[in-house]
A protein has these predicted regions:
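Secondary-structure capping and boundary motifs in well-ordered enzyme cores
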Residues: 49, 67, 162, 189-198, ...
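Extended redox/cofactor-interaction regions of prokaryotic respiratory oxidoreductases
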Residues: 1-32, 41-44, 70, 154-157, ...
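Acidic/polar loop patches that form or flank catalytic/metal-binding clefts of enzymes
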Residues: 84-89, 180-181, 197-200, 229-238
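Short, hydrophobic/amphipathic alpha-helical patches that form generic packing surfaces
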Residues: 73-78, 218-225
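A glycine-rich phosphate-binding loop feature that marks nucleotide/adenosyl-phosphate handling sites
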Residues: 92-97, 187-188, 203-205, 235-246
Length: 364
């Protein structure tokens, strides 16, 4: 969540997708209504169901369940096709000008990107992402095209990828009325103008999918294109409350992070602290500080026993075994006898978790 709830009063347009703000997050709705009353803000509701939020929305787009990513892809295409993006923001504060390796490719026939291969360990398609990397000069600086006209720059690759997301195609996929799509796209993309602020609100209706991460990334891409990040009334705002998602991540209760949002060590790929730092430290961006965070964490855990001579106690830190221990995978392991017991505390996974039918089947 990038903005706080009372900041909503500064928004010009709200998009509520994958959530029911009026019913499930009434305090946030208070600030939405304040913006509507004081500055004439508009509310778009995207939902398969006519919820209480949809009932009071200025524009309601009824889509089929599970087609959020198509709807958002259509919005991205509309922004790009009609040049509604905030050009100054996109050029200076996103990677749109960056040049990608020339051998990057996307196959429209099978929907796979370059580098795809069958991973026998995961029994699924994985990617060698080398072709996705940026072009760099001799000093390892990313090559850029400020005009964003080079066919290998991120902006042109984005345009090409989303060019098939026409209103006609999106209407066919989502079942939404083309006029409602057009109206919602036009209204929300208007926030790409200087001095305007668009706010996207979402909840579990966006995240609880096998492609939930892609849904949220699509939301983020919309806001970056429109320059709606880092401003009052803008942002990508998850409506928290269910299952305390924020707390579970901030407190590192999930298997894919340790405190400080650090990737967990892996006994196969990062058996030593040197391996971890080399693998998990990017060449640029805020996470170049990751080695400092890891050492600070080890010192906090092990105190004076952690020092440079013993890798600051890195070998004492539990490590992943390379297998999938994510939420769904754990329950699948129950059905295969790998997990033989479970203590369920203050949770009802048969109801509140994703793929509830599969949850109940796996537990049996």
């Amino acid at each position: 969540m990038t903005n706080h709830w009372n900041d909503y009063q500064h928004s010009d347009v709200f998009m509520n997708i994958g959530g029911n703000t009026a019913e499930n997050h009434p305090i946030s709705m208070k600030w939405i209504e304040k913006a509507r009353e004081k500055k004439g803000a508009k509310l778009i509701a995207v939902d398969p169901r006519i919820s209480r939020t949809a009932a009071v929305a200025d524009v309601y787009v009824q889509i089929r369940p599970g087609t959020n990513i198509a709807y958002l892809g259509g919005l991205i295409n509309y922004i790009l096709e009609n040049e509604r993006y905030h050009e100054e923001y996109v050029e200076n504060y996103t990677n749109a000008t960056y040049l990608v390796n020339e051998d990057y490719d996307f196959n429209e026939t099978d929907g796979l990107f370059s580098g795809a291969y069958d991973d026998p360990v995961r029994n699924a398609t994985s990617y060698d992402t080398e072709s996705w990397m940026y072009q760099r000069d001799e000093e390892d600086n990313v090559l850029k095209d400020p005009t964003m006209e080079d066919p290998n720059c991120v902006m042109q690759l984005l345009k090409n990828h989303y060019s098939q997301y026409t209103i006609e195609n999106i209407s066919e996929i989502t079942g939404a009325d083309p006029e409602a799509l057009q109206e919602s796209y036009e209204l929300f993309s208007s926030t790409g103008e200087a001095g305007k602020a668009g706010n996207i609100l979402y909840a579990m209706g966006i995240t609880q999918f096998t492609h939930g991460a892609q849904n949220v990334r699509a939301v983020a891409m919309v806001q970056l294109l429109l320059g709606n990040m880092g401003i009052a009334g803008g942002g990508v705002n998850a409506q928290r409350g269910q299952s305390n998602v924020q707390g579970s991540t901030d407190m590192a209760m999930l298997y894919h992070i340790i405190p400080g949002y650090l990737p967990p060590p892996n006994q196969n790929s990062t058996p030593t602290l040197e391996d971890y730092i080399e693998k998990e430290t990017p060449p640029a961006g805020w996470w170049v500080h990751r080695p400092k965070y890891m050492v600070s964490l080890l010192k906090a855990f092990y105190g004076d026993n952690a020092n440079g001579a013993n890798e600051f106690g890195y070998q004492w830190l539990p490590k992943l075994d390379g297998l999938d221990h994510s939420h769904i995978a754990q329950y699948k392991d129950m059905s295969e006898g790998i997990v033989e017991g479970m203590i369920c505390w203050a949770d009802n996974p048969a109801v509140s978790g994703p793929s509830a039918g599969a949850m109940r089947e796996y537990q049996n």
